Amino acid sequence: MKKQWKKIVLFVLPVIITLITLSSFLFYNQDVVHNWSSSRMTYGRFLEYIDMNWVKKVDLYDNARTAIVDIINPDIKGEEQLVRVELPTFSSELVSKLKNKLIDFDAHPSSSNVNLVSWLSNLLLPLILIITLFFFFRRGNKSSSGPGQAFNFGKAKARFHMEAKTGIVFEDVAGIEEAKEELQEIVAFLKDSRKFTNVGATIPKGVLLVGPPGTGKTLLAKAIAGEASAPFFSISGSEFVEMFVGVGASRVRDLFKKAKEKAPCIVFIDEIDAVGRQRGVGIGGGNDEREQTLNQLLTEMDGFSGDTGVIVVAATNRIDVLDSALLRPGRFDRQIMVSLPNINGRLAILKVHSKKKKIHKDVLLEVIARRTPGFSGADLANLLNEAAILTVRRGKVEITMKEIEDSIDKIIAGLEGSPLADSRIKRLIAYHEAGHAVAATFLPHHDPVQKVTLIPRRQAKGLTWFLPNDDQFLVSKSQILSKIIAALAGRAMEEIVFGLPEVTIGAANDIKQVTFMARQMVTKFGMSKVGPICLENSSSEVFIGRDLMGRHELSEEMVAKVDLEVRSILKDCYIQARTILSQNRKLIDRVVNELVEKETIEAKEFMRIVEERV
């Protein structure tokens, strides 16, 4: 209640004082109010009015610098009107003129009260502002957190937990068993360090979690906080640097000062690449401030002070931009790769997230895990949540396989659009998708077809889905060529059925992808006549922390040879696609008829059509 009254008084008091000051000023200076309400007239026109006998009375103010004149205005039928006239400094002839014309005039000296109130009003308003700002600064200085703290810029914004209760333990983390094992050792060290020190082991000073977004790096940190019985500090890398010089380094010092007081403890820095980027390339003062912050971080982690009992756990998905001094042993003794989960990892993650969902007994998590290669843990959690929302939308009480499959399609390809009307365009799209599906079926190294559909999603008017048999960590040349042939089969089918002049832009994305794959075969994988040589630009991107300018190291002759080889690969694959499609034209016509009628063909039905024709 007291805080509320303080806020009310703090807001109302300056307003009341301001209103009182203005009212007092206006009360003592009625002449000014009179002047404000008057119209203005030039001095020359005023003299003309005197000569025309249209002036009745003149009142002089401000030491004869201003005159309020009572005139007869001929423009409004001779009615009287008050006007204001600014007089020149030397206007002695004015008094003579007024006397000669027998015009009543009077001089009004300045009031001492008015001058005093005017002086006080000019002084009081800035004084109120200064006192109010000082009150806010005092209040912010007493507080330990929150915005508007002018004296606390150098204080670290880390969240401190004596025994963090995040609600997450290692049992809640699945699919990244290797990373869990490494971090469980650190938790065990904090709980009972004697069994480690007995054999001469020392506690790691830093652990860097590296991996793509959504793989569970922050989740692992929460699990550490939930498992360890040690003090836990958490902060984001972006919270160190501010607009003021020196604030970042000051916050690093403050953070580690607090951490040393609670040692042994854990400091978790999320997105450390925001402050730990490679030094020496940026332009401008902002980069200098970031480098000062990084230098202070390096000193605190392994400087002259030696072992402090503070374990730093950091997370990043951009290890390539981090400064090499930050990555050396003694600062980050362990670099733990948190990769995208394989099929077994995805299955374990799905089991964890499905515990709190009402899943129908017919749902096969193994099939879902196989259908989601490349999905991170966050993607899988989002998948089941989307399926749950879709279940409620459809009025069901349990999540079925249909909702999960539709959610996978939505996440990968976007929202489902309106079905196409029966037309020539619909048949053209059907031939395009049937070309992809049939060509892939007759390529021994290609993934099997999972579904063919004419339901639009995002920019795609039709889609052909493939189901990989397993996670492909190593891809062969035959597999890459098979993917290129199947991708070009859509354009090839359009040309076979409708002729070259009628091909559409529908294959634009296919052409973009196959060009990239073919160029990778030549310049990176050494799978061409150019030979096993890496021709990619090895320099890093501009401004990510290493090189200021990118360099192109290939000769013009080699660039021409690469382009020629890429065109040769794509041309050969296109010819093979046309050959496969021409040999199976009747099968493709059957698939197209089914597609136009049903709009979606699942894997079992598609294979039944293929087996009947073959």
UniProtKB/Swiss-Prot annotation:
**Keywords, in A-Z order:** ATP-binding, Chloroplast, Hydrolase, Membrane, Metal-binding, Metalloprotease, Nucleotide-binding, Plastid, Protease, Thylakoid, Transmembrane, Transmembrane helix, Zinc
Cofactor(s), by name? Zn(2+)
Which residues catalyse the reaction?
A: E433
Q: What class of enzyme is it?
A: hydrolase
Keyword Repeat annotated: no
The note on cofactor binding and number reads: Binds 1 zinc ion per subunit.
Q: Which PROSITE patterns match?
A: AAA
Source species, domain of life: Eukaryota
Record's InterPro entries? Answer: AAA+_ATPase, AAA_lid_3, ATPase_AAA_core, ATPase_AAA_CS, FtsH, P-loop_NTPase, Pept_M41_FtsH_extracell, Peptidase_M41
Q: Which residues form the signal peptide?
A: none
Q: Where in the cell is it found?
A: Plastid, Chloroplast thylakoid membrane
Membrane topology is: Multi-pass membrane protein
Family statement: In the central section; belongs to the AAA ATPase family.
Q: Which HAMAP family match?
A: FtsH (MF_01458)
Purpose: Acts as a processive, ATP-dependent zinc metallopeptidase.
What is the recorded name of this protein?
A: ATP-dependent zinc metalloprotease FtsH
This chain's source organism reads Cyanidium caldarium
